[in-house]
Swiss-Prot record:
Its EC number is 2.7.7.-, 2.7.7.108. Pfam families: SelO. This is Protein nucleotidyltransferase YdiU. It comes from the Bacteria. Keywords: ATP-binding, Magnesium, Manganese, Metal-binding, Nucleotide-binding, Nucleotidyltransferase, Transferase. Mg(2+) binds at residues 247, 256. Belongs to the SELO family. The keyword Cell wall biogenesis/degradation does not apply. The gene is ydiU. It catalyses: L-seryl-[protein] + ATP = 3-O-(5'-adenylyl)-L-seryl-[protein] + diphosphate; L-threonyl-[protein] + ATP = 3-O-(5'-adenylyl)-L-threonyl-[protein] + diphosphate; L-tyrosyl-[protein] + ATP = O-(5'-adenylyl)-L-tyrosyl-[protein] + diphosphate; L-histidyl-[protein] + UTP = N(tele)-(5'-uridylyl)-L-histidyl-[protein] + diphosphate. The active site is at 246 (proton acceptor). ATP binds at residues 84, 86-87, 107, 119-120, 170, 177, 256. Its cofactor is Mg(2+); Mn(2+).
Length: 480
């Protein structure tokens, strides 16, 4: 079996052929077998000897077309044209059983022409975090890139301190970012911009070609997909942390994991990135940043669309986001009617857990056990403001009774949308600490529960607990 190389073949001057550089003592330590099988990749590839030969062998044809892509991006609101794949290469594309194409991208591959004097490596810490987060989001139903396999090494790399290098093969529909379009537009390379659009229409947005204005249809698709994604982030309490436009995928998926976090206590102003001193990418700011980023992308459509067309496409963002968010929040509360009363119940519930600084995920999981005819003491005892909680609960119970859905059915549905297990940063750190000492057992155990987030099992109770005080609201470094 061979990979396809459509991007490198058709857009070879939009980047550079770059072979991966071997790390010291590479070891294949984890393979995502389910994803491997979905991509119809041979199991024989994913052995220690085979994958090392394919990635680093002097005569390997596997990396003949490995490719570093060039792009720019708005970083914390400022334009930076000097970006690109600085630590990874596109290996090629594999097709699943439905004929859909998926990029295979090697992260931590070593220096590229876009490394900006850096070593081109990824550290074990950040690689494990991306592996865990992408699997956690995928199994919650949130669109995301995914991790195919993990390779460790003994090679030292230097960030805030000395760490070990690692590699990961990432899978995504493509690795085309908002910043690809921005770069060629702002650089005045309109021929390359046109070829990038043509490539996207052929390989990723073919349905748009049937529209009167394919470029408008493409922009509208990116707008609504991005809105839907960010609505899911908000509903599931996920803070990306570094929503620069070079970290935004044209497919509306979670992409480029850095200093992310799932919420602990519900705090809309939470900032997970310790470099984000002004809170630009705070949890509550994500919807507005999403629109800002889409507006930045839309400039690249101006050679093809009028200002009115672009404004019309961008105007769909808020309605798409709110429709998805409202539906998800109703489902999380087990409410099926889209009424003003339902919206008020959702807002008052969020205000209640915010005022009492309750854990976002545990609060929703407790809500799954509510009996519309019972006292529900465990839920009441969960709050400091018990009288306020009781008042809200009475209104909630009345709404449940009015809609008439059987309790067992409602509770089952709620348990399938409110996860028992989410990726807490402190749990990730415990797994990282063990892995850095050669023990991947905690990483694998954590990975297993994140791949089954809605299935409560007594033997995994430690992963459902709220974080200890030292593990709350951890701010994470961008260094990777």
């Amino acid at each position: 079996m061979n990979l396809d190389h459509s991007y490198a073949t058709h857009l070879g001057d939009l980047g550079a052929l770059t072979k991966p550089l071997r790390v010291a003592n590479p070891q294949l330590v984890e393979v995502n077998h389910t994803l491997r099988d979905a991509l119809q990749l041979p199991a024989s590839w994913f052995t220690q000897s085979s994958i090392m030969s394919m990635l680093f062998g002097n005569t390997s044809s596997f990396t003949t077309h490995s490719f570093a892509q060039k792009y720019g991006g708005h970083q914390f609101g400022g334009w930076n044209p000097d970006l690109g794949d600085g630590r990874g290469v596109l290996l090629g594309e594999a097709k699943d059983k439905f004929g859909k194409s998926w990029d295979l991208h090697l992260k931590g591959a070593g220096p590229t022409p876009y490394s900006r004097f850096a070593d081109g490596r990824a550290v074990l810490r950040s690689t494990l975090r991306e592996y865990l987060a992408s699997e956690a989001l995928h199994h919650m139903g949130i669109p995301t890139s995914r991790a195919l396999c993990l390779i460790t090494s003994d090679e030292p790399v230097y960030r805030e301190k000395q760490e070990k290098a690692a590699m990961m093969i990432r899978v995504s529909q493509s690795h085309i970012r908002f910043g690809h379009f921005e770069y060629f537009y702002h650089n005045g390379e309109l021929d390359k911009l046109k070829r990038l659009f043509d490539y996207c229409f052929e390989h990723h947005f073919s349905a748009c070609l049937h529209s009167e204005s394919p470029h408008l249809a493409m922009l509208e698709k990116i707008v609504t997909d991005t809105a839907t994604l960010i609505a899911k982030w908000q509903a599931y309490g996920f803070n990306h942390g570094v929503m620069n436009t070079d970290n935004m995928s044209i497919h509306g998926i979670t992409f480029d994991f850095g200093p992310y976090a799932f919420l602990d206590d519900f705090n809309p102003k939470f900032v997970c990135n310790h470099s984000d001193h002004r809170g630009r990418y705070a949890f509550e700011q994500q919807p507005s940043v999403g629109l800002w980023n889409l507006n930045a992308l839309a400039h690249a459509f101006t050679p093809y669309l009028s200002v009115e067309q672009i404004k019309g496409a961008l105007s769909q963002y808020e309605a798409s986001l709110m429709a998805e968010f409202s539906q998800l929040m109703r489902q999380k509360l087990g409410l099926y009617e889209n009424t003003q009363n339902t919206a008020e119940l959702v807002n008052r519930w969020l205000d209640l857990i915010y005022q009492d600084k309750r854990d976002y995920h545990i609060s929703f999981r407790l809500l799954c056990e509510v009996d519309e005819h019972g006292e529900n003491q465990p839920l009441v005892d969960h709050f400091i403001q018990r009288d306020t909680a009781k008042t809200w609960l009475e209104h909630y119970q009345n709404a449940l009774i009015t809609q008439g859905v059987k309790r067992q059915e409602r509770q089952a549905n709620m348990r399938n949308i409110n996860p028992e297990y989410v990726l807490r940063n402190y749990q990730a750190q415990l797994a990282i600490d063990a892995a850095q000492n050669g023990d991947f057992s905690r990483f694998r155990k954590l990975l297993h529960v994140l791949q089954h987030p809605f299935e409560s099992k007594p033997e995994y109770a430690e992963f459902a607990k709220p974080p200890p005080n030292w593990g709350k609201h951890m701010e994470i470094s961008c260094s990777s």
